[in-house]
UniProtKB/Swiss-Prot annotation:
The keyword Membrane applies. It is a single-pass membrane protein. The gene is atpF. It comes from Cupriavidus taiwanensis (strain DSM 17343 / BCRC 17206 / CCUG 44338 / CIP 107171 / LMG 19424 / R1). GO terms for cellular component: plasma membrane; proton-transporting ATP synthase complex. HAMAP family: ATP_synth_b_bprime (MF_01398). Belongs to the ATPase B chain family. The chain crosses the membrane at residues 7-27. Keywords: ATP synthesis, Cell inner membrane, Cell membrane, CF(0), Hydrogen ion transport, Ion transport, Membrane, Transmembrane, Transmembrane helix, Transport. F(1)F(0) ATP synthase produces ATP from ADP in the presence of a proton or sodium gradient. F-type ATPases consist of two structural domains, F(1) containing the extramembraneous catalytic core and F(0) containing the membrane proton channel, linked together by a central stalk and a peripheral stalk. During catalysis, ATP synthesis in the catalytic domain of F(1) is coupled via a rotary mechanism of the central stalk subunits to proton translocation. Component of the F(0) channel, it forms part of the peripheral stalk, linking F(1) to F(0). GO terms for molecular function: proton-transporting ATP synthase activity, rotational mechanism; proton-transporting ATPase activity, rotational mechanism. This is ATP synthase subunit b. Coiled coil: none annotated. The keyword Hydrolase does not apply.
Length: 156
């Protein structure tokens, strides 16, 4: 191998270039690459965090929807129960009112029947007295007696 001055000059230039690159170019380049790697890592971490938050939010939404469905079903059941109770109460009130009206009608019918019996008794008593008067006014014989009884029957 031939070692001459050119070779040594090239080595000196190479080391100077290496020193300049190592001193002025390499640190900013490494810094830029590190910053880029950090931004990428931060972006991936933010994406993972966002994904986890999205899953958590979806779980909360699903839970809230389930609670809303349960609450809605409970409200519907309560409303149906109240409606049934109200319907039963209305039915009982209607039955009680019907029983009251029937009892009142029976009482009125009995009162009318009692009044009719009393009126009939009064009329029968009056007729009996009239019949007795007529019998006593006339002479008592069988033919007159039969005629008076027939007349009383006709009046009744």
């Amino acid at each position: 191998m031939n070692l001459n001055a050119t070779f040594f000059a090239q080595m000196v230039v190479f080391f100077i270039l290496w020193w300049v690159v190592a001193k002025f170019i390499w640190p900013p380049l490494v810094k830029a690459l590190d910053e880029r790697a950090k931004k990428i890592a931060d972006g991936l971490a933010a994406a993972e965090k966002g994904k986890a938050e999205l899953e958590l939010a979806n779980k909360r939404v699903d839970q809230a929807m389930a609670e809303a469905r349960t609450e809605g079903a409970q409200r519907v059941a309560d409303a149906e129960k109240r409606a049934q109770l109200t319907a039963d109460e209305i039915k009982q009130n209607a039955q009680a009112e019907a029983a009251r009206i029937i009892a009142q009608a029976k009482a009125e019918a009995e009162q009318q029947a009692t009044r009719a019996r009393e009126a009939l008794r009064d009329q029968v008593a009056v007729l009996a007295v009239k019949g007795a008067e007529q019998i006593l006014k006339r002479e008592v014989n069988a033919q007159v007696h039969a005629d008076l009884l027939n007349q009383l029957k006709a009046e009744l």
